[in-house]
């Protein structure tokens, strides 16, 4: 009813308003239609159908034919609707620009909000352009403008205000903007505040001055302080009173008596009025001002008729709504009473139901009435839709006519002059006409009436909206009533059903008795069957027990011969034969054809996979897993037997419960029988009148009896199937389970019997093994690896040559891919864990994967060693050589291992003499006849040798250790990679070992394990020498004897991955799907699990040590990100962590770590659509697919250990998967030690250990950095400090204030350097690399002995040291001498405090790559000085624009930035535009194209005009060009003095890619577009020569070029993307100069200026005063943490430089006196992907820096003779040649800049004097 009444009230006014709108649309008035619910109605003017006027092309219609309101005249004379977005009804003829924009809008089409307003003006409704809420929309708006950012409104405040919403006063002002009527006023401290501040310092709310200087006091520092007198405001001469400490007059200085009080009416003297009185006086003054302001505000409130009418309307509406609400409440109470009465008795229930049915009919009639009104509304809406369709058709007709009559054609000069004469005549005719005063008056009157009608309609519209808000409430109440009625009806039906069921049960009792008797008989029979089954089960259980004992015997036999499984030589032969897959043809093809490198890379990838499929390693691993399989079989048999036993026990329990159930059913049967007898007696005693009824009841009872019998039989069946009540079923199950246990036992016996037989056969066959098979395998492996070793260096040399020729071309990616595949091939060879037998004459040269730089300070090598069986006649082992790692000359710089005098001896040489460390505690002759672990280690000059002797029968191990130390100064093993060899077991005949290692070759078996953190193998060899297969049978090794290999774990080296195909073969996706895995890693980032299916994916990865889950199963809302936001579980601590991923009910993802819930996430219900899973990584083609790269930028493979991968609790052996790559067995402890740490300038690590740094201390570490300053190490004990730091590239050691510094000052070169510091009572020494510096007698006396204490020391920085900045770079291989521990390398993972430090990744840094641009705008040749400065020779290649995408290893992702520094872009495509002369210039092109040329290019644009291609001679007489005009392609060149012009018919500015070929052959031209349209023209040939001279301009031309030949609109730069420029089939890629060209980015763009990673800068068009006073403000969104932002430089050396450094903003200024600077480190990182505002203010010698809400300032020296200079300003970068020696070259800025303002004036980069490099002016990739 409310709906119908509301429509009846609103409909007449709405019809009246529609009629008014129709009059407004058809008449000559200025009214524009009213907007309903945001829709914008635009009138139309339909010309008469009888006579349609035709206007000639280019003529205007007579002035009398003026268009109606809302339309304008086009050049063709038609009336076209104004496009003002509903915010105006007037626009200018000809252009269509809107005037008189309303609703706070502006712009050519009223599409923008006015300054100070915010909203969506396109919606065309007044509520969408609202005043800026800064802080309040209307009453307190103190912003110039505002904008939205991340859903919040950000304000650009007036000068006096600050804060995101201008909610507080700026520094130097006071007030409370949040208080209505309050404003921010300037602080008035009478000039007595701190002069070093830019502004006066006062309380930001009250305005009371702080820190009054010059002996003043008071609220505004307006009077002299107590004890002083004088003029504090003007003269500022407050002097000390001469009253002997007594009071004096504050003005005259006259001494006053103690307790003096001034006369009434005078101000209180200073001595008697305390601060509280003055504060109270000031507060009262402020209160009075606030009262006056509030009074004026109240008086200004409008109390006119309109306000009263509005209030009355609101009151009337409220009263009406209250009345209707009370009516609804009364009805609701009535309904409630009726429902309560219905629940009391059944009779009242039936009457109430009838009453409710009647009321329901009434409600139905009302609903039909509402439905009828709704149908009327729908019909009315349909009429409106039809009118809208008619309007759309008319608009389309007008548009077609406009296109037909408005098509532009090129006019000859004669036609243009004729048109101008005609236009002048028309203008004169217009001027001669009389003005339209009368019409204007009529229009104004009608406009006033329309506005009045509009206001009335708006008030009715508000009433209508308020009424509509009541509809949901009313409808909700109706729904509640209907629901209650439905519930009541259901309750009645249920009650009736219960009555009928009761009657049925009473009639069926007789039949139940008979059925229960039969049931009891059946139960007795089942009991007999149960007893028989129990006896059978007891007999069956004896068989599994016997089987288990037999299996135990088999296991013992298998474990006894398990050590010989590794010697399965027949399987070894197959694996070794697969290693020769690399052919010479592949290498030659890669050298000859660089363009086919990708295809060869794919081929190598396939061969790489095939080298590990079904070969030696896999079969050897299969053999090593036999024991594990046997254990699994036995375990499964035990579980099956236990399950059978439990089932039998449950059967006993079920049988014991049968008796109870039988008794219960018997009692029930008796009760039913009694009830039946009672009913029968009642039936016999009934009267004859009830006989008929009784007969009917009996018939029904019989029918129900048969139905009940059926139901009872079903119940009996269910009873038999019950878990506790059915003995037969449980016994059957027990019988089946027992039989299954027997079958499993037999299968285990059948499976283990062949194994036992095979073990026996292998043991016998290995004694008589045919050496020919192994000879073939070893020779095949030797040839393959020899070929690989010879081919790979040649291939790498050739690839390096290609990369040097084109350092950043697209070939680099393919070259890098080949390198990666070669590394993976070597990685596979390194993981072959099989030993080699040496006979004393054989030798192996191993290929070391470890960097020689990593071996300088720290070297650790481990291997398995088994000496030969000792002959009885020998008492000790003969001297033997084991291994050598060092230089080829073998005179210095080496390490080795040998057996001397029956002792294992570790030898190392650091440049002068040998150090020998014999392990004399365990002679070699006493070693067991199986493998032992040997480990040699060196830290600096300290060396160790370890021996671990395992036990085959237990897990016990014997450990032996021996230490040694080099007595000289050297501490580095300085090896040259080109001059280093690694020999094992022996050496070739042409190599001469050093004297200490010149021994006979080793006899026995060796197997390499690790070198530093890398896994190595003898099978990754370069050469083998004298390896005789007949005597070199590898020895079997029982890995299970060693502690580190007892767990079935896998090692991922960061380059490989495991693949499990068809995981559903062992488990199914169900209601609960679960993945489990255990990981152990010190790394920060890595991929753990990945599943991919098209665009759908699931990914579990680690970022900064915390888990992230990304998944998309085809969700409509896109991918879901599950993140450990609370940081509950950090897993990169080198400990095992159990990770579980649970997917519940296809709609909830749960992350569990170490059995603790971390986080869960709900999603759209969707099943998991995957079958394959990648573990620890994935192939590059998977990681780099577009579907993953859009959401998953992290593509770092996992490095560390994994074990226990399970799907649905089913285990998978990762090494059994055929596609597993780069995964080894075991978990080497050395690979999990964090020996290195990376610091970012804001990080450090700390530990507390017992070390004495001031007494007998020695320590050392490696460091690598590009920064000249930084704190490397810090320790403090009270006032005594021990530190090592970098200062301008010099290493400085500071011990208790005494500094020792290195001689060399260039240690910030990005190379690794080793520092050793030693402190003794008489000398402090510092050694950097091999340079020693010392300070003797540091204390000039006896040094005080100090005890070692446990105090904290720091690496990489310190939170308590302010002298040095924190370190940026890598620190590794640190060690200390301790009292209680041996010298060993520090494991940073054990440190207690780690702040923003990466303990795994240590990126290799190098000097930044700068793009050298030429000075000036249009110079075509580079200057020699720039070549010298850049270090390039004359033949150095010019900048290649294709090289904008550098290889990933040279441009790593900034780990501290949220956004990638290289946004997604189309390969080899570049974006032009933004400036009028955006372009690339190409010079020195090969080949002559004077007679004939064929150019091709791809383009994409939405612009209608622009230059694409241009080349000419110097005078531009001969030229060739391709450009866009009106969206059409135009190809033009000259033939003599004539111009040949080919123009396309279609437009190609549709935003799609198009291929264009333009061909010139003397006087003929051809234009081919997309290979489909061929346009051809020709001119008569001439004998004139056609000569052009470069450069070729692409995307635009230099200023002043092409004006002679091309129309002005098409001279400016092409706006769009160009790609693949070719000349005669050859690509043109090397650009000599680039101006405002960036890669063609994909994805959304936003307004701003983008500076790409390739470097570039903008030179502003106006000079800038960098002298005494200025203010710069701008917003940035960086994609790197460092870079130049603004730079200005004068000729006399003064400069301003604003730049970022590791997230810190720094301002450096030189004012002619000296340098001074300030910096701000924001709390919120600048690299968080959001916009940040930076402001730099300078006033004389004071410079203030604002970064968001953080403020800092510096006061520099005053220049007595300052000079203002106006010099160019560089933004985003600066040429290196302009930097002074005091300014180190900085990286160019990478990211976006917008809203750049200088001294309050916005700066437009599109008007810049120069845009050089990769800079996009008007667009920026969105975050």
Curated annotation (Swiss-Prot):
- Intrachain S-S bonds: 82-91, 84-98, 101-110, 113-129, 132-146, 134-155, 157-166, 169-184, 187-202, 189-209, 212-221, 224-238, 1005-1035, 1201-1227, 1370-1402, 1617-1640, 1792-1820
Query: Which residues lie within the region annotated Disordered?
Result: 1419-1440
Question: Which locations, inside or outside the cell, does it occupy?
Answer: Secreted, Extracellular space, Extracellular matrix, Basement membrane; Secreted
- State the UniProt keywords alphabetically: Basement membrane, Cardiomyopathy, Cell adhesion, Coiled coil, Disease variant, Disulfide bond, Extracellular matrix, Glycoprotein, Laminin EGF-like domain, Proteoglycan, Repeat, Secreted, Signal
Q: Which GO terms describe its cellular component?
A: basement membrane; collagen-containing extracellular matrix; extracellular exosome; extracellular region
Q: Which positions fall inside the Laminin G-like domain?
A: 833-1035, 1047-1227, 1234-1402, 1469-1640, 1647-1820
Q: Which PROSITE patterns match?
A: EGF_1 (PS00022), EGF_LAM_1 (PS01248), EGF_LAM_2 (PS50027), LAM_G_DOMAIN (PS50025)
**Chief location of this protein within or outside the cell:** secreted
Domain comment, in the record's words? The alpha-helical domains I and II are thought to interact with other laminin chains to form a coiled coil structure. Domain G is globular.
Disease linkage: Cardiomyopathy, dilated, 1JJ: A disorder characterized by ventricular dilation and impaired systolic function, resulting in congestive heart failure and arrhythmia. Patients are at risk of premature death.
Subunit structure comment from the entry:
Laminin is a complex glycoprotein, consisting of three different polypeptide chains (alpha, beta, gamma), which are bound to each other by disulfide bonds into a cross-shaped molecule comprising one long and three short arms with globules at each end. Alpha-4 is a subunit of laminin-8 (laminin-411), laminin-9 (laminin-421) and laminin-14 (laminin-423).
Q: What is this protein called?
A: Laminin subunit alpha-4
Q: List the gene name.
A: LAMA4
